[in-house]
Amino acid sequence: MFVKVCGVRNAADVAAGVAAGADALGFMLTESVRKLDTGTARALAAELPPGVLSVGVVNGVPAAEAGRLALAAGVRALQLHGRYTREDFAALAHLPLRLLRATHLDPDSAEPPELATGAYGEEMLLLDSPSYGRGERWDLGRLESARPSGKWLLAGGLTPANVAGAIRVAKPWGVDVSSGVESSRGIKDPQLIRDFVAAAKNAAKAENAENVENA
């Protein structure tokens, strides 16, 4: 189970994520209560061991600006939220960055988004709440008619208390958390980070064991 902790802001957050066993840490590079300037993000990304992926997260800025921010921040991956097109992803493909595409299931839309990982040239897909970053859960029952394929991460209102159940229902390749491991908005809690990573990885192990038993 791939676990990404998003919205880390300082060295203590980074240390907590690494110690907990997170596979990726996300740095907000555009408007957010968790936003970092590229210099701070670069310094924090440099602290990560090779096995932990540094991800720059952007929302709504032009693709060229997103790429510039990611390179300035020294991250190894770029996650794009918003109305980005295949052409936008193609324009970023030459950069030395792994690409993540974030989308959501809009209950008011008659046409679901493209849910096949790689459809836009991205390596990973993140399926989030329509109001991402606010800790709001969404109806996982929607996945019955629109389920992602490939390497996809579930996000939106996940916490240490509910992530195991969400994994059982959604069966994602990975999970992403931000506000669910905060003591107050924008303030990460090391214990909650530890609890979340452990709960997610233990749930995945239980799922795998059950699948083997039923094979």
Sequence positions of predicted segments:
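C-terminal active-site rim and adjoining tail of enzyme catalytic domains
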Residues: 151, 155-162, 167-181, 187, ...
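C-terminal helical cap(s) of enzyme catalytic domains, especially alpha/beta-barrels
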Residues: 39-48, 91-92, 178-208, 212-215
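Conserved, mostly hydrophobic/aromatic
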Residues: 17, 78, 125, 139, ...
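Contiguous, function-dense segments enriched for cysteine-driven chemistry
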Residues: 52, 129, 140, 144, ...
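Extreme N-terminal starter segment of soluble prokaryotic enzymes
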Residues: 1-4
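Conserved anion-binding
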Residues: 24, 29-162
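Ligand-binding grooves and catalytic loops that recognize ribose/phosphate and carbohydrate rings
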Residues: 113-124, 171-172, 189, 198-199
